[in-house]
Design a protein with these regions (language model features):
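Short, Gly/Pro- and small/polar-rich lid/capping loops
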Residues: 8-51
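Adenosine-phosphate binding glycine-rich loop
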Residues: 10-15, 210-211, 315-425
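Glycine-rich, N-terminal phosphate-binding loop and its surrounding beta-alpha-beta segment
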Residues: 50-122
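Glycine/serine-rich phosphate-binding loop and adjoining beta1-alpha1 elements at the start
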Residues: 85, 105-219
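General beta-strand structural signal in soluble alpha/beta enzymes
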Residues: 95, 152-153, 176-182, 248-251, ...
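Rossmann-like adenosine-cofactor binding region
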Residues: 254-344
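Glycine-rich phosphate/diphosphate-binding loop of Rossmann-like nucleotide-binding domains
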Residues: 191-295
Length: 425
């Protein structure tokens, strides 16, 4: 499999914006992209930084910093999650917004790319403090969001309750209920059936398609999953039901291994009761770093960025890597995995189940008509299977790896839209 040549220096390796830009640049060169379009697509259209006060429970006033980056909206409203974490940076949000542009284009849904975040430690904040912070953040960016401008969604440390607060705040400002300003909402206020497990379901679909493409069988296929949150746990549960053997679960505080397969339903119940997978008796405690490089057919990084780097890429033994997380593989590691001929389903395809289901939710909200879960799942799987075929055919036709093919396909679609619309000036 040809390498991507998407080079960055070692000290830039874990900067997500540098990594994304390196991949974009290489794909754009392969496309012979017009220099003007290259400039348009490489740069975010809008970057919003807000600093705002929040009254804490003890009477103190704390200042918080929030971001919303809208990378490109040529194909439709911006679309992307909002994350709450102490380590959120503008570069991270900028990269994630760009990935959303390419992700939406790869699966051919009518959204552009956006992302948001607030620098905060949710573990040290009460529910009331989180609500006040969320509502104030929403009010600070309210002129730039909306069903036809930029649609928000859950991400790291945010959930359907966060989306309900954002939707309510926006609606109060508009003077009427606007459910379609966010996706990932509770069902009773315009959420969609099937949305919660959609990203995990999409990961399973991409694993199925990878095995089909490589003429490998599901039976006996050993899988290691890094991360057991929403994406990882749902992917594990659905894949276990399909006949995959989930032999390893790697989490931040430790991992689990069972060569005969982990009982995923029991593990989900155990984590729900205890808040951790540590201590689960149905598997052997194993350092997470060891699990990433253990023997398996499929490795699914499904938690955070920069999990596969130059430090461990040469030790990866998996035949297939399906990226359930955003940016789990650095550009430097990409080169190493390509040399090892590891089949990669890149993040902008592998975890696109979430944004695809979000698109369905947005459509249902705007129609005021809601689908059965079976319809959501059927439509989701059809789009993701077709998108897999699009990417691998593009890779074969252009003699590039899957990641660069996905970027090229996405860039080509967005660039074509811009050329059709023209530059307003």
């Amino acid at each position: 499999m040809p390498t991507s040549n998407a080079k960055v220096s070692l000290d830039q390796e874990i900067n997500p914006w540098e990594a994304q830009s390196a991949r974009f640049d290489f794909a754009a060169r392969k496309l012979n992209l017009d220099e003007g379009l290259w400039k348009v697509l490489r740069s975010p259209a809008r970057e919003i930084i807000v600093h705002f006060p929040v009254s804490m429970d003890d009477g103190r006033i704390e200042m918080f910093t929030g971001f919303r980056v809208q990378h490109n909206i040529a194909r439709g409203p911006g679309k992307g999650g909002v994350r709450y974490a102490p380590e959120v940076t503008l570069d991270e949000v900028r990269a994630l917004a760009s990935w959303m542009t390419w992700k939406c284009a790869v699966v051919n849904i009518p959204f552009g790319g956006a992302k948001g975040g607030v620098i905060c430690d949710t573990k040290s904040m009460s529910k009331g403090e989180l609500e006040r912070m969320t509502r104030r953040y929403t009010s600070e960016i309210i002129d730039f969001i909306g069903p036809e401008k930029d649609v928000l969604a859950p991400d790291v440390n945010t959930n359907e309750q966060t989306m309900a607060w954002i939707m309510d705040t926006y609606s109060m400002h508009m003077g009427h209920t606007v459910t379609s300003v966010v996706t990932g909402k509770p069902l009773n206020i315009g959420g969609s059936r099937g949305r919660l497990e959609a990203t995990g379901r999409g990961v399973m679909v991409e694993c199925d398609e990878s095995l089909r493409y490589l003429n490998m069988a599901i039976e006996g296929c050993r899988v290691v999953i890094q991360g057991f949150g929403n994406v990882g746990s749902n992917a594990a549960r659905l894949m276990k039901e399909q006949g995959y053997k989930i032999v390893g679960i790697a989490e931040k505080d430790g991992g689990l291994y069972n060569s005969n397969g982990i009982d995923i339903h029991q593990l989900i119940e155990y984590k729900y009761r205890n808040g951790t997978t540590l201590g689960f008796r149905g598997a052997e405690a194993t350092p997470s770093e060891e699990l990433l490089v253990s023997d398996c057919e499929i490795l699914i990084p499904a938690a955070t960025e920069n999990v596969i780097t130059s430090r461990n890429a040469d030790k990866i033994k998996a035949r297939i890597v399906v990226e359930g997380a955003n940016g789990p593989t650095t550009a430097v590691a990409d080169e190493i995995l390509a040399e090892k001929r590891i089949f990669i389903v890149p993040d902008i395809l592998a975890n696109a189940g979430g944004v695809t289901a979000s698109y369905f939710e947005w459509v249902q909200d705007r129609q005021g008509y809601f689908w059965k879960e079976a319809v959501v799942n059927e439509q989701l799987e059809t789009i993701l299977r077709d998108s897999f075929d699009d990417v691998v055919r593009y890779a074969e036709a252009h003699n590039v790896n899957n990641r660069i093919a996905a970027y090229m396909l996405a860039i080509d679609r967005v660039a074509y839209t811009i050329k059709q619309r023209g530059i307003y000036a």
